[in-house]
Every structure is written in C-alpha cells, then in structure tokens.
Amino acid sequence: RTTHFWISIFCLVSMLPILGFLKNYKNIQNEEANIMSSKDEPSIKLSNNQLQIILMFAGVCCCVAMSMPQVHMVALCVDNGFGLQVGTEILAVMLYSGMISRIVFGFLSDKIGPLPTILLGSFLQMVSLVFFLPFNSQLSLYMVSLMFGLSQGGIVPAYAIIIRKYLPLQQAGVRVGLVLGATIVGMALGGWISGEIFDLTQSYYLAFVNG
C-alpha cells in the first residue's frame, strides 16, 4: 500500500510536466505521411467498426490469459510453500521481463508489422502458460515466469499500432481508448475467473488451462 502511494506521487509529479511538453508539441503529420506509413501494409477486408470489435474482443481474451499468472502468482507460491518473498520475486521477474518485451516487440512491429507481431505474441503467451502446468518447483516458476513476461509484454502496444495503421487517424484517440478499456476488462475478468476456478477446484491447474 505504501509502495502504491509513493508510485502515485511520482506519477503525479513527473507526468504533469511531460503532458505540458506534449501539449505544445507541434503536429506535423500530413496526408503524404499517412500514405507512407501504411503503403506496405496488407489490406484488411473489414469495415472500421468490424475491425474495432475484433480488436476489443481480442483484447479481452488476451488479457484474461495474461492476468492469471500476474494476479495469482504470489498466492500460488505461498500455496506451494515457497513463501511470500519468493512469490514477490517471481512476479517481479515476470513484470521486468514484460517491460523488456514491450520494447523488443515494438522493434518487431516495425520490421514485420503489428498483425504478425500480435499473433506471435499471443501464441508465445499461450505456450508459456502451458509450461506452468507440468512445472511447480521454485526454479521452474522463475524460468517460466521469465518466459511468460518476455512473450506477453508486447501484445497490448501492438493494438495501438494496428489502429494507427488501419483505422482513421482522426478517430485514433477514441478507438485506442476503447481497445485499452477492453484489455482492462480482460485483466479484471481473468483475475476474477481464475480465483473462482481455484475456489471450486482448490487447484490452479484448471485456471491455467482456462488461460
């Protein structure tokens, strides 16, 4: 609780000046830049609203899977007898590696495009979740959590890139907000439903299967 408080103070102090800087940043985008940004991208035979709905649905689903280890890792470690500190360390490994993957997947999106990137990230996230099923030792949880973090961190940013490339620029703010809102719903739903599954089965096995 104290940590969250001081993080909030840091965000308040640091983000307000940054927002002031961005507010005065001149927008130099033009029609030619918009054409150049998307000329190498494959066309999508969907309406704007259809693509929006698909992205929101994908955002919910990917974050249901993403939230399961993040929300319940500490409890899983405590249940396995590793203790609270080990659970916190494993969660930190997962989140730090997720920070790295956000940057790496950003470079990857520039190279192969956001659609292949999001498919690759989702596939790797699924594979890493599968590895949680047979392994429950302390070392294996460190390794699988590292793998999971490296796979999932770049998924959500790819949604914003897809919107930038395939949907009207004038609507980008609203559309990105809707997709990110859907991912937050997915994170909440995934954490809750995994807890419900654990309460019913007294095991996280089916919770990982659900993810």
Indicate residue ranges for each PLM-predicted region.
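C-terminal membrane-cytosol helix-exit motif in multi-pass small-molecule transporters
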Residues: 8-35
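Structural signature of the two symmetry-related core transmembrane helices
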Residues: 116-131
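Extracytoplasmic gate region of multi-pass secondary transporters
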Residues: 49-107, 114, 190
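Paired small-residue
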Residues: 128, 139-147
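Intracellular juxtamembrane helix-capping segments at the cytosolic ends
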Residues: 154-167
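A late C-terminal transmembrane helix in Major Facilitator Superfamily
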Residues: 166-203
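Juxtamembrane helix-start motifs in multi-pass secondary transporters
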Residues: 3, 114-120, 206
